[in-house]
């Protein structure tokens, strides 16, 4: 199975594209988008962040690897799924903020993918 890029790698790639979302929020949004029935798109940030002007990640960069690894993990019948959050050794407020960001991203991505469908 493809390994998830680190939160720092995702944040660096995110800044390169000019995205304001945290690594946790991007991963949550991608997971929500895919769980809600959204297509697995190379240009996923534009769909997940509802901004058609966003460029697609370059093939092989951290955001592209995030898409590939997340898709593989969600399809894993052995439930090999990990969240992109703050390190376990990070202070509790930082970890809580990352979990909040992930959940906010998931709900947004799921809502965008599901649209009006229940």
What do these predicted regions represent?
Residues 1-103, 107-118:
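Domain-length accessory/inserted modules outside core catalytic folds
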